[in-house]
Amino acid sequence: MLETGVLVIGGGNAGCAAAIASARHGARTTLVERYGFLGGTATAAMVGPWMTFHSGGDRIVGGIAQEIVERLMAKGASPGHVADSSDYVATITPFDPEVHKAVLFEMMREAGVELLLHGYFLSTETVGDGVTGATFATVAGSRRYQATVAIDATADALVAHSAGVPTQQGDERGRVQPASLMFRLSHVDMHELARYVREHPDQMRTSLAPGQRKAAALTAVAGLNEIWQAAVRDNIVDVPRELVSIFASPYADEVIVNMTRVVNINPLDPDDLTRAEVEARLQTMQLLDFFRTRVPGFANSRIAATGTQIGIRESRRIVGRYTLTADDVLNARQFDDAVARSAYPIDVHNPSGSGTTTKRLAPGKSYEIPYRCMVPVNREQLLVAGRCISTTHEALASVRLTPTVMTLGQAAGTAAALAVRSGSMVGEVDPAQLRATLEADGVDLRRT
């Protein structure tokens, strides 16, 4: 058995931020990831751009998340935060997933995080109410770790579920949001697309005047309704989407396509997950044909990359010491133990068909997420970070976005390191001390 101070299971964006924060605060930290790279949905599923670091004109996400963006910018792999030309959020943050993988490895080395890649979680070890370690499958057999604190950053609450933490899934009928496989198209003539949306001003959701719709300004295009509906009628596509949804990448002739949709799935059922992967890749080929034959500027486009796996919006959520609700989100609620802020709307993609329901905060407002959402109701020395924290189905539709989960990860790693240093339980970490430490590390917890 190997020993560590803080054991982070899952090397996605939440897990990476947790491991970096923990190690920077002096805890011996081990991160175990199932793939041969880090980044989770941002790299394995290529989910991007990141949405959103801002509420109106104010940046509300900082810390490690902002540091990652600045490192990507320094490598020419992100333009930083740019205005969302589709008016869905204030800003979006395009990035290159391949460079993001390398940036995360650099940050792990600098912080002194011990890595185990290609490690597949099998089970937890508990003593009384405490989680004391975990076992993983590796190419050389099983490997056990004993830890003072464990952080579940698996996105599916695998560790918490194994440890007997109560969980919930989906809406009141158990339905979860659909899954989507992201892909990138290169060799795109953005000037031709811009010309089309200038000449057809009602075919794009935007506040940009037609004359402002230049290629460089089109960071996101949502619409092209007439083109899409005609393709559906002509049986070019059979995808349960209501509009075209594409985003600019860091590179001038490339776009990110977020349009595949596999409905009626349970992402924790391996057969459903298999079906979703197959259906999404077949949808991708339909969409490639659609773009080449119907959308101006895409005649010579090629698939530059697809996600290693399909993107999952929702699976398990733990029951924590507090459950964040839709009312908390929409009313911009504040908490004494808040560790993160977000202004992303509640957007629920229809679990069984096309359409998306969106509920927004008041302009310029943001809500807070309390530390208690990461602390299981019945276990000690275990924290949960990422989309599987304690929320309702609707609240999760806002919380799940990458900038937010990176901040939650930083909070979890910081709290774990504080607990190791003081010899306390994670549920006993002083919220005021945690908040002060996070703010000193660049996390924006200001109140407006």
List each language-model region with its residue ranges.
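Beta1/beta-strand and adjacent pyrophosphate-binding region of the FAD-binding site
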Residues: M1-G12
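N-terminal Rossmann-fold NAD(P) dinucleotide-binding loop
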Residues: G15
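Conserved N-terminal/central alpha/beta ligand/cofactor-binding core
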Residues: A21, A27-R28, E33-S123, V127, ...
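Flavin (FAD/FMN)-binding glycine-rich loop and adjacent Rossmann-like elements that form
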Residues: T41, G141-V149, A153-T448
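Conserved beta-strand-loop-beta-strand element in the redox core of flavoprotein oxidoreductases
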Residues: E125-R144
